[in-house]
Amino acid sequence: MYASLMDVGQTLAARLADSDGNGANDSGLLATGQGLEQEQEGLALDMGHNASADGGIVPYVPVLDRPETYIVTVLYTLIFIVGVLGNGTLVIIFFRHRSMRNIPNTYILSLALADLLVILVCVPVATIVYTQESWPFERNMCRISEFFKDISIGVSVFTLTALSGERYCAIVNPLRKLQTKPLTVFTAVMIWILAILLGMPSVLFSDIKSYPVFTATGNMTIEVCSPFRDPEYAKFMVAGKALVYYLLPLSIIGALYIMMAKRLHMSARNMPGEQQSMQSRTQARARLHVARMVVAFVVVFFICFFPYHVFELWYHFYPTAEEDFDEFWNVLRIVGFCTSFLNSCVNPVALYCVSGVFRQHFNRYLCCICVKRQPHLRQHSTATGMMDNTSVMSMRRSTYVGGTAGNLRASLHRNSNHGVGGAGGGVGGGVGSGRVGSFHRQDSMPLQHGNAHGGGAGGGSSGLGAGGRTAAVSEKSFINRYESGVMRY
């Protein structure tokens, strides 16, 4: 897959960059325009003269003599370990904890499965090939490796787009009918089917190509795994992947988050002053933290694949790419392929940083740290990453609940002032309790009807001042229980 960092020539390494699917695609081969003859389909290369840029003969550098061989191998090993542990833990958390099986976490599970696919299949193959002079496997392994890599990329980017769309709907219309879990599962399955269909060209056209090369001890033939059958097909596939897997999803996700930001800004401006201080600090923060989790995944994905797409587009479409190929572009090329694999292991790391719930589960499963379950952690930090079902309900109804709480507080406060005499106390307590009971029935909050109505009855029959005291106690206890229940709903 990669060329030598130190001794690469200007033309042949760029020409062999077509075969960037797996491990030894160019293997540090050295040559320039002189002595390079390409047939109609670019399959037969005469490399009897490996010349440097000034025309001197440069011997082929064996794989084990290149420093990047060891650097990339160590990096791939770390990617494999971190990716298996992180994504494997995500899968375990989802299936072992029922409270984690909600809509956003279903998409996160799909991301983890796609990352595990490329880590368990493609990363070991790339690691082995990078230490070999030639492609060591059969043709089927070449096709499978390229196929799984394309599936993983497709599932990742399409899932991030779907997750961003789900967040947009939840923020713009928090009172909408909640998306059902079967519909979410259906969407995730369709994403996998679409990714498989888009990856089929890799199965059909990936093949092993042979290139003769001149060495200090004589001529040898190097086999590489190439996903492109010819230069024109390579241009079509590079442009198509950059559009479908990168530019188009980035545009859609960017538009969704711009509209989300405008909506949240307008909601904050239109909120009354008394409600603004309460709601903007609690419920709006919950929605923003969930959006921050999605943004973290999106930023990681597009940063990791940016060098890869930049190099591929430059090489295949820039007219003088072969002549301009130098150490900078070679390093960028190696970095691009490494970061594309790195993307498969950094999602759990990003989730660990932004989610208190996942951090708690991760420590329990992998670090053998005894973490106590703290209710306040589940009420507040769950909205920042992997969320339980109660946090999702809270985010989607936060606008309605917060506004009603402010009105209810004012209503209860006014009613409590009526408890001056015996008759007035009864009316005040009864009205206050009636409003509490009515709101409870409408939004299904876990409060006790009997206590509220009992307070009203007691206020009406207890005599001087009883109604006012009952209403005041009812207001305080209800508001406390209500505000704590908002984050659990």
Curated annotation (Swiss-Prot):
GO terms for cellular component: membrane; plasma membrane. The chain crosses the membrane at residues 75-95, 108-128, 144-164, 185-205, 236-256, 294-314, 334-354. One of its GO terms (biological process) is neuropeptide signaling pathway. Disruption phenotype: Reduced levels of insulin-like peptide Ilp5 mRNA, reduced secretion of Ilp2 and Ilp5 proteins in mid-L3 larvae, growth defects and developmental delay during larval stages. Residues 452-468 have a biased composition (Gly residues). Glycans are attached at residues 25, 50, 219. This is Neuropeptide CCHamide-2 receptor. It comes from Drosophila melanogaster. The gene is CCHa2-R.
